[in-house]
Design a protein with these regions (language model features):
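Cytosolic ligand/metal-binding cores
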Residues: 1-34, 142-172, 260, 264-338
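An N-terminal JmjN-like helical accessory module and its immediate linker preceding a catalytic domain
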Residues: 1-81
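Non-catalytic accessory segments adjacent to catalytic cores
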Residues: 2, 6, 88-220, 314-316
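A short, Trp-centered hydrophobic/proline-enriched beta-strand micro-motif
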Residues: 33-40, 57-64, 106-108, 213-215, ...
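An anion-binding catalytic pocket shared by soluble metabolic enzymes
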Residues: 65-68, 74-78, 219-302, 313-318
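Generic, well-ordered alpha-helical scaffold segments in large soluble proteins
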Residues: 202, 206, 237-241, 306-314, ...
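Short glycine/threonine-rich loop-to-helix capping motif typified by GTGT followed
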Residues: 225-230, 329-333, 365
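Conserved hydrophobic core element of enzyme catalytic domains
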Residues: 339-369
Length: 369
């Protein structure tokens, strides 16, 4: 990626005028036959949801971990194949105009557990996998930055983009309104309890026969809210209820895949990688029973072993505690073991994702079955 620094005063709070001028200049300097362009300018510090509320119908991405920078996105400037070489090729043909200390551009992606799994409702809108660069990306930590990506050939509609910038800036400066009181919800469709019981018994039988070591069963449930609460309202409630979890969302048309997860599949910073096994659950007040349970311990260890096995080809060292700890969430307790490693050579994070996803914590052993 070709980076171009731009003079941006970082003393004090960023101003609309200075950031708008930088954006306007970068757009004006881009020719009709120019490469892809990403412009990153300082922005007001606000919750990542503030960008999404500026244009709710254009929301595309939210990534909001509890202890590091959050990102949100509007629109899709570029869809990429979920592969390391596709990402590298795109950024090699991209100019990045940014101020000092600005974050690097970021793409966002996701993948189903198995090829073809997205052929059925409710996953049809999302496909088996995706990788995208939002048109507008808001990065927020101690500082905040707003990025615009222009990837279409030909001259861009600069006046329209600047109008959108003004609307976004106004949303970032306004506090998010008070969320209404909790509303009731009712289930209108869920798996038959008898069929569910039969499925669980079948799983237990196959484990006894040695076909599987671990299986995570799942149920489909449709819930209807009594009010017209939207996806952004649900995400705000998740933030309030599960502050230690990562909020994430992907919008596609009228559909939204969203949640708040305590799990970390993989994090890579330089040559250091971090994963964790989060398997084994119980209610509050029952931690001692969970930690003493041979069943919970054995199933947890299957997840630890799978993560170690997946990372071993890439790492020259791996370490994890001998004993798991208890991870406390507002509604449940989990057994947790962090796994740290050091890469023997530079490795793209997508290769690590491919080696681990899905872990037995959310799937089973053996995974391919």
């Amino acid at each position: 990626m070709r980076s171009h620094s731009a003079a941006v005063a970082l003393e004090g709070a960023p101003t609309r005028e200075a950031s708008r001028a930088l954006l306007e200049q970068a757009l004006r300097n881009r020719g009709s036959d120019a490469a892809n362009l990403i412009v990153t300018v300082p922005a007001p510090v606000a919750p990542p949801d503030a960008l999404l509320r500026a244009f709710p119908s254009e929301a595309s991405i939210l990534w909001d971990p509890p202890r590091s920078a959050a990102c949100s996105g509007l629109g899709v400037a570029k869809s990429l194949a979920p592969a390391a070489d596709a990402i590298a090729g795109f950024f090699d043909a991209t100019d990045h105009v940014a101020g000092a200390a600005s974050p690097s551009p970021r793409v966002f992606g996701g993948a189903s557990f198995a090829q073809g799994a997205a052929k059925h409702l409710p996953w049809e809108a999302f496909g088996d996998g995706f990788l995208l660069l939002p048109t507008w990306t808001y990065h927020v930590d101690e500082r905040a930055w707003l990025s615009l990506a222009v990837c279409e050939p030909g001259e861009s509609d600069n006046p329209r983009l600047l109008e959108v910038f003004d609307t976004i800036w106004g949303s970032l400066e306004r506090p998010i309104g008070v969320i209404p009181s909790p509303v009731s919800a009712r289930r209108i469709d869920e798996a038959d309890r008898g069929a569910w019981t039969e499925q669980v018994e079948e799983i237990r039988r196959r484990i006894r026969e040695g076909a599987f070591e671990k299986v995570v069963a799942a149920r489909h449930c449709v819930v209807e809210l009594d009010t017209g609460a939207g996806s952004l309202d649900v995400l705000k409630r998740l933030e309030e209820r599960f502050p230690g979890c990562t909020r994430c969302a992907r919008w596609r048309g009228d559909a939204a895949l969203l949640g708040a997860t305590p799990e970390l599949l993989i994090s890579r910073r330089g040559s250091s990688v971090l994963s964790e096994a989060l398997a084994g659950s119980t209610a509050h007040g029952d931690a001692a029973r969970m930690m003493a349970s041979s069943k919970e311990r054995e199933e947890h260890q299957l997840v630890v072993q799978a993560i170690l096995k997946g990372l071993e080809p890439f790492c020259d060292s791996l370490r994890c505690p001998r004993e798991p700890s208890v991870r406390e969430l507002p509604n449940v307790l989990h057994m947790q073991t962090p796994v740290e490693g050091h890469l023997r050579e530079p490795t793209h994070v997508l290769e690590l994702v491919r080696a681990l996803h899905p872990t037995p914590a959310v799937g089973g052993v053996p995974t391919r079955e």
